[in-house]
C-alpha cells in the first residue's frame, strides 16, 4: 500500500436523532479519529497561465524535448541546487495538456509534502505549474549513515498509541520491501491489510523532520501517520485516504425515490461512450453474471468487514437485474435492488468521467486498462448496506493501481430505515472523492487534498457533481438543491444551506471559510461557488438532456457538461494541496486550454460574486474581493 484518502459524506449523525448531521458539525471525524490537529499546513504555490507565459518566455526550449523533458528542465532551472525525482504517473490529458509530477528529495529520501507539478501545452511550452518544494536549510548529513533513529516497529507502536488505532502490534515484525527504507509489518491484527512504514522527510514549521510514514488501513480510516523518527510517540501529521444488461433502477438524473419511479434500462453502456469496451460485466478476460465487471464490483457487506470477494451479489445468467423496491420495505428486503442501483450509478458515472478525461492514464478505476496506460487492477469495490456504520458513506482512494473502496450505509433517521445506495447524489459524491484524489497531484499521489482547505474542496467537488447531474430540463438558475435530504429524512438536507444562486438563500462567500475548521463546511462554500459557475455556463450554452456530452473541438457543447469538464480539467492543473484561489485560477486556465478562454468572463462573474474576484490575493486572512477583470 502507498498513500490513500478516506473521505466521508458528512459528520456523524447521532443515533435516533434526525436533526443533527453536517449542519451542526464539530471538527470530529465521522469515523472517530480527529485528524484536524494533524493536517499539513498549506504551502502550495500556483502560477496560472498568464503569469506563466510572462515568467517563462526566456526559458530555453528544445524542439527535440518531449513534454517530460521540458517539465524537468523547468524544475531544474527553478531550483538548480535541489534534488528531486520524476513520479512515474505523467500523461497527456484529453485536452492536450501534458501533466508531469515531481517529488523533492534530500539524501535520496523523499520529502513527502514537497511536490512540483508542471503542465505542458499543445505547443510544447509550459502552460502552468505549481510547487510546494522546501526552500530552507537541508540536513548536512545523511541520516542513513549513522542510522540514529528508531526502528519502524517502534514507529508503528507510536502511531497506534498516539492515535488510539484499533491495531494490535504485539508480535509485529518489520519485513523489508524492494523500495529502500520501506517495510511491511507481519504479526499484527486489527487492520484490513498489513501495515507499512517508509522513512521520509516532511517539511513543517520551516524545517525538515525525518519521520516514519506509517500506513494503517482500519476500514473507515486509511491513515498515513508521520511519526517522528526518534520521538516515536510524536505524530507530526496525518493523512486519511478515506476524506462516503437489463436493470430496473432509478434512471440517471433521478436523485432519489422522491423524483420518480424505477424503470427498465437495457445495455446502458451503449449510451455512455467508450469508457466500458467490455460492457459493465466483463474485464477482457472474464465475463460475469453478477454485479461485477471491469469498473465496479458491487456487493453487500452486512458485517462491515474487509472481505468483499465472496460477498453476496445479485446473479442473473440472462443479465436481467430486475428487483422490487417500495418505500415500506426494510433495506435488507431490497438489497438486490440496492446493489443493482449502486452498480448502475457508479458505472454510469465512471463512463461520464471517462468522456471528460478521467481515463486510464489519468488514474481511473479499472481492472483492465486495455493497453491505454496507467496502472490497472484497481476497479472500485463498492459495498452496499455496509455494516460498519450508519447515516454516512465514505470512499477510500489509494494511488493508481490499488482498488478504490466505497462503503454505503443505511440511514436510521426514518422508519423504515433508508438506504444511501438509492440516493444517487451520495454515491456520486463518494465516487468523486476518487476522481479528485487521483487527479490532484497526479494518480500516484493520493495525499494532495490532505490540508484543510484542499480537503474542503474535495468535499465540495463531490457535492458539485452530485448536484450538476440531478438538474432537470425545466430547472432555471432560480432552482435550489439540497444534499442528502432523502436519506437523512431531513428537510433542507445535511448542509448548512441549499445550493442556490440566490445570495439570500445561500449567502456563502469565500470569507466565510475563515471561521471554519471542518472540511464539509468548507466544501459547502466551494460547491456553492461552483453552482454559480454551473448556471453561468448553462445560461451561455444551454443544457443537454443526454447522459453523455456532445463534443465540438474537444469541448462539451452544452453548459452543464462544459462546467463538469472544466472543473475536472482544473484538478489536473492545480498544485498539490491547493487553496480556493489556486483552484479558481486552474479552472480559468482549463478554459483557456480548452476553448481559448471563451468563458473567462462567465467564470469570473461567478467567482467574483462569491468573493474570489480578480484582484484577490491569498494571504493570512480570507477577505472577499468582488472585482471583475478589466477585459470583462
UniProtKB/Swiss-Prot annotation:
One of its GO terms (biological process) is proteolysis. Binds 1 zinc ion per subunit. Its cofactor is Zn(2+). It is found in: Secreted. GO terms for cellular component: extracellular region. Keywords: Glycoprotein, Hydrolase, Metal-binding, Metalloprotease, Protease, Secreted, Signal, Virulence, Zinc, Zymogen. Pfam families: FTP, Peptidase_M36. The active site is at 430. Glycans are attached at residue 270. GO terms for molecular function: metalloendopeptidase activity; zinc ion binding. Residues 20-244 form a propeptide. It comes from the Eukaryota. Its EC number is 3.4.24.-. Residues 1-19 form the signal peptide. Coiled coil: none annotated. Zn(2+) binds at residues 429, 433. Its main location: secreted. Belongs to the peptidase M36 family. PANTHER family: EXTRACELLULAR METALLOPROTEINASE MEP (PTHR33478:SF1). Secreted metalloproteinase probably acting as a virulence factor. This is Extracellular metalloproteinase 2. It comes from Trichophyton tonsurans.
Amino acid at each position: 500500500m502507498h498513500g490513500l484518502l478516506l473521505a466521508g459524506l458528512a459528520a456523524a449523525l447521532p443515533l435516533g436523532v434526525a436533526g443533527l448531521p453536517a449542519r451542526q458539525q464539530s471538527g470530529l471525524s465521522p469515523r472517530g479519529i480527529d485528524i484536524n490537529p494533524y493536517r499539513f499546513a498549506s504551502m502550495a504555490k500556483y502560477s496560472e497561465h498568464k503569469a506563466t507565459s510572462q515568467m517563462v518566455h526566456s526559458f530555453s526550449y528544445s524542439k527535440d524535448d518531449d513534454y517530460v523533458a521540458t517539465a524537468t528542465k523547468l524544475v531544474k532551472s527553478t531550483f538548480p541546487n535541489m534534488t528531486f525525482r520524476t513520479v512515474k504517473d505523467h500523461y497527456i490529458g484529453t485536452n492536450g495538456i501534458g501533466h508531469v509530477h515531481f517529488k523533492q528529495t534530500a539524501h535520496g529520501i523523499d520529502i513527502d509534502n514537497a511536490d512540483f507539478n508542471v503542465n505542458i501545452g499543445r505547443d510544447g511550452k509550459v502552460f502552468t505549474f505549481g510547487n510546494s518544494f522546501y526552500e530552507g536549510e537541508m540536513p548536512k548529513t545523511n541520516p542513513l549513515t549513522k542510522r540514529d533513529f528508531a526502528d519502524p516497529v517502534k514507529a508503528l507502536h507510536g502511531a497506534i498509541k498516539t492515535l488510539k488505532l484499533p491495531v494490535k502490534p504485539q508480535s509485529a515484525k518489520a519485513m523489508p520491501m524492494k523500495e529502500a527504507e520501506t517495510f511491511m509489518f507481519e504479526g499484527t491484527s486489527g487492520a484490513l491489510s498489513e501495515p507499512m512504514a517508509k522513512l521520509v522527510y516532511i517539511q513543517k514549521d520551516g524545517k525538515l523532520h525525518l519521520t516514519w510514514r506509517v500506513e494503517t488501513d482500519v476500514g473507515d480510516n486509511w491513515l498515513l501517520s508521520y511519526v517522528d523518527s526518534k520521538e516515536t510517540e510524536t505524530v507530526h501529521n496525518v493523512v486519511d485516504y478515506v476524506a462516503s444488461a437489463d436493470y430496473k433502477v432509478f434512471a440517471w438524473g433521478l436523485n432519489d425515490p422522491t423524483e420518480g419511479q424505477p424503470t427498465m434500462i437495457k445495455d446502458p453502456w451503449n449510451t455512455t461512450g467508450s469508457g466500458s469496451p467490455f460492457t459493465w460485466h466483463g474485464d477482457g478476460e472474464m465475463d460475469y453474471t453478477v454485479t461485477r465487471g471491469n469498473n465496479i464490483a458491487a456487493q453487500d457487506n452486512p458485517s462491515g468487514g474487509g472481505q468483499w470477494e465472496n460477498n453476496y451479489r445479485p446473479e442473473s445468467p440472462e443479465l436481467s437485474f430486475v428487483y422490487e423496491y417500495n418505500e415500506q420495505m426494510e433495506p435488507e428486503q431490497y438489497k438486490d435492488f440496492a446493489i443493482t442501483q449502486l452498480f448502475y450509478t457508479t458505472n454510469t458515472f465512471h463512463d461520464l468521467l471517462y468522456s471528460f478525461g478521467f481515463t486510464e492514464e489519468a488514474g481511473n478505476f479499472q481492472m483492465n486498462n486495455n493497453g491505454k496506460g496507467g496502472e490497472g487492477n484497481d476497479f472500485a469495490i463498492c459495498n452496499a448496506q455496509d455494516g460498519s456504520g450508519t447515516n454516512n458513506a465514505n470512499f477510500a482512494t489509494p494511488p493508481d493501481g490499488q482498488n478504490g473502496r466505497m462503503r454505503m450505509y443505511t440511514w436510521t433517521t426514518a422508519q423504515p430505515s433508508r438506504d444511501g445506495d438509492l440516493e444517487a447524489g451520495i454515491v456520486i459524491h463518494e465516487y468523486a472523492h476518487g476522481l479528485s484524489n487521483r487527479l490532484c497531484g497526479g494518480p500516484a499521489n493520493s495525499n494532495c487534498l490532505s490540508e484543510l482547505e484542499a480537503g474542503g474542496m474535495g468535499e465540495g467537488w463531490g457535492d458539485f457533481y452530485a448536484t450538476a447531474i440531478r438538474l432537470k430540463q425545466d430547472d432555471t438558475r432560480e432552482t435550489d438543491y439540497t444534499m442528502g435530504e432523502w436519506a437523512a429524512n431531513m428537510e433542507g438536507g445535511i448542509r448548512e444551506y441549499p445550493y442556490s444562486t440566490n445570495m439570500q438563500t445561500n449567502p456563502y462567500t469565500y470569507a466565510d471559510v475563515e471561521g471554519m475548521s471542518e472540511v464539509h463546511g468548507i466544501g459547502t462554500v466551494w460547491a456553492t461557488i461552483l453552482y454559480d459557475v454551473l448556471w453561468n455556463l448553462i445560461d451561455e450554452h444551454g443544457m443537454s438532456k443526454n447522459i453523455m456530452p456532445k463534443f465540438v473541438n474537444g469541448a462539451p457543447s452544452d453548459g452543464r457538461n462544459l462546467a463538469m469538464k472544466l472543473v475536472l480539467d482544473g484538478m489536473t492543473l492545480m498544485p498539490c494541496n491547493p487553496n480556493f484561489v489556486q483552484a479558481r485560477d486552474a479552472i480559468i486556465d482549463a478554459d483557456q486550454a480548452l476553448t481559448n478562454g471563451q468563458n473567462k468572463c462567465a467564470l469570473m462573474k461567478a467567482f467574483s460574486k462569491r468573493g474570489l474576484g480578480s484582484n484577490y490575493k491569498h494571504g493570512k486572512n480570507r477577505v472577499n474581493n468582488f472585482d471583475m477583470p478589466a477585459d470583462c
